[in-house]
UniProtKB/Swiss-Prot annotation:
The keyword Isomerase applies. Keywords: ATP-binding, Chaperone, Cytoplasm, Isomerase, Nucleotide-binding. Its EC number is 5.6.1.7. CDD domains: GroEL. It comes from Shewanella pealeana (strain ATCC 700345 / ANG-SQ1). GO terms for cellular component: cytoplasm. GO terms for molecular function: ATP binding; ATP-dependent protein folding chaperone; isomerase activity; unfolded protein binding. This is Chaperonin GroEL. It comes from the Bacteria. Transmembrane segments: none annotated. Together with its co-chaperonin GroES, plays an essential role in assisting protein folding. The GroEL-GroES system forms a nano-cage that allows encapsulation of the non-native substrate proteins and provides a physical environment optimized to promote and accelerate protein folding. Pfam families: Cpn60_TCP1. ATP binds at residues 30-33, 51, 87-91, 415, 495. PANTHER family: 60 KDA HEAT SHOCK PROTEIN, MITOCHONDRIAL.
Length: 547
């Protein structure tokens, strides 16, 4: 076991604070509309230019082990805020630095660290409750666009494209961000349910100009097994021929004689039919077949629940307004399922997603939910160079997370104003001694830090701006974008309540732990000089005759 170096008391806290400051100072230059960029060196490819707090924090690793421990703990603040709300990482870092700095000063002055932490915790609990009171619902497209714009560093085009995407696919819909090919941002919306399985035979194509199959008002047969015997399909096909409507078969697979007969019937015009494989594998395939059944008002023919394909009737089939099949995917538009059943299925999947511990499973469940709820939107980010593309894509992703958070928990005045108002509204809290009271004061003072930093990044004096804002009431605040004061909501400067709340809670939690640190343990760094015992390798020169 390697030897350890141990630091106690003030020596440990000074080192830890140095690490906190290095990381926080690198992150906080990005805060606000006039925040600067940070350039991150990459071992391969072009450097990454970013204004995303968590991206900067993740890159920082310090040489001094004790300083690095402080930096890593603040990195955890940014990371947790990012996981919870997807934004607010820089705000969380600024809050953590402010609480740690003031807290360690108080500890050095002889105050009890545990009482300070209890005071900070009480102030934060009161602040979170007050934030909920200040919060306003965010449901209209204009407010969603404003939240996205602020989060994307005042880029209105990003805010608007996110608001449009949400309007098109609904609040539960899936919105993904991809790198585009053009200079401008583009929005692609796939309405209806789409899954990545194409036609099983090109002979099903009835739109040669697009290379696709289009079925108008088709019946949809859902089978949870391989179909290879045409006799199993005959009762359905005979019933279908009388109606004159087309048929889509979604099965584990359709092969051999069954596929050949379907192709021949389709080409002769006896029955208009197309077949695709069911999406997913194993249990996920069963679940997705059930999703399609609920969406289209059909029944999944599965032997495990006692249903046989030969005995299926037209009543077991689902229906939709339209189906489009390409070689890669199938889209079912306007399924005729019952609205109440679709909503119940979405609610059921939502509960599964919330309870899931796997990120992959969560993502797949959310995709299923979106396909049932209305569709999928893809924002294709446009830029002139790859470096700009990466920076812009990160901003779009942040803005998307922020708008989702705003829809979930509402919005408060942006620009750090909400925390200043919250701090001013918290009155006397139930504390048992002076040290706890000082802990409350530390937390309330720290709540001004984001506003001060936004002002400082805009070239203003933070204290002057903070005093001006404190003298105002309600949503009155400082717009760093154009250096004016006014009503933040009217100016469209909004922050999601969830983002502000998460930043405050995570910052106070980890900062409180750092204040109560009394001892730090790290491995002793071995000098390169101590590694000099490897010099005896020089006797390999006689290997030349091996050629």
């Amino acid at each position: 076991m390697a030897a350890k170096e141990v630091l106690f008391g003030n020596d440990a806290r000074v080192k830890m604070l140095a690490g906190v400051n290095i990381l926080a100072n690198a992150v906080k230059v990005t805060l606000g509309p006039k925040g600067r960029n940070v350039v991150l060196d990459k071992s391969f490819g072009a450097p990454l230019i970013t204004k995303d707090g968590v991206s900067v924090a993740k890159e920082i690793e310090l040489e001094d082990k004790f300083e690095n421990m402080g930096a890593q703990m603040v990195k955890e603040v940014a990371s947790k805020a990012n996981d919870a709300a997807g934004d607010g990482t820089t705000t969380a870092t600024v809050l953590a630095q402010a609480i740690v700095t003031e807290g360690l000063k108080a500890v050095a002055a002889g105050m009890n660290p545990m009482d300070l932490k209890r005071g900070i915790d009480k102030a934060v609990v009161a602040a979170v409750a007050e934030l909920k009171n200040l919060s306003q619902e965010c449901s209209d497209t204009k407010a969603i666009a404003q939240v996205g714009t602020i989060s994307a560093n005042s880029d209105e085009s990003i805010g608007e494209i996110i608001a449009t995407a949400m309007e098109r696919v609904g609040k539960e819909g899936v919105i993904t961000v991809e790198e585009g090919q053009a200079l401008e941002n583009e929005l692609d919306v796939v309405e209806g349910m789409q899954f990545d399985r194409g036609y099983l035979s090109p002979y099903f194509i009835n739109k040669p100009e697009t290379g696709s199959v289009e079925l108008e008002s088709p019946f949809i047969l859902l089978v949870d097994k391989k179909v290879s015997n045409i006799r199993e399909l005959l009762p359905i096909l005979e019933g279908l021929a009388k109606t004159g409507k087309p048929l889509l078969i979604v099965a584990e697979d359709v092969e051999g004689e069954a596929l050949a007969t379907l192709v021949v019937n389709n080409m002769r015009g006896i029955v208009k039919v197309a077949a695709v494989k069911a999406p997913g594998f194993g249990d996920r395939r069963k679940a997705m077949l059930q999703d399609i059944a609920i969406l289209t008002g059909g029944t999944v023919i599965a032997e495990e629940i006692g249903l046989e394909l030969e005995k299926a009737t037209l009543e077991d089939l689902g229906t939709a307004k339209r189906v489009i099949i390409t070689k890669d995917d199938t889209t079912i538009i306007d399924g005729n399922g019952e609205e109440t059943q679709i909503k119940a299925r979405v609610a059921q999947i939502k509960i599964q997603a919330e309870e899931s511990t796997s990120d992959y499973d969560k993502e797949k469940l959310q995709e299923r939910m979106a396909k049932l709820a209305g569709g999928v939107a893809v924002i294709k980010v446009g830029a002139a160079t790859e470096v700009e593309m990466k920076e812009k894509k990160a901003r779009v992703e942040d803005a998307l997370h922020a708008t989702r958070a705003a829809v979930e928990e509402g919005v408060v005045a942006g620009g750090g104003v909400a925390l200043v108002r919250v701090a001013s509204k918290i009155g006397e809290l139930d504390v048992i001694n002076e040290d706890q009271k000082h802990g409350v004061i530390i937390a309330l003072r720290a709540m001004e830090a984001p506003l001060r930093q936004i002002a400082a990044n805009a070239g203003e004096e933070g204290s002057v701006v903070a005093n001006n804002v404190k003298n105002g009431t309600g949503n009155y605040g400082y717009n760093a974008g154009n250096d004016t004061y006014g009503d933040m909501l009217e100016m469209g400067i909004l922050d999601p309540t969830k983002v502000t709340r998460s930043a405050l809670q995570f910052a106070s939690s980890i900062a409180g732990l750092m204040i109560t640190t009394e001892c730090m343990v790290a491995e002793v760094k071995e000098d390169a000089a101590d590694m000099g015992g490897m010099g005896g390798m020089g006797g390999m020169g006689g290997m030349g005759g091996m050629m």
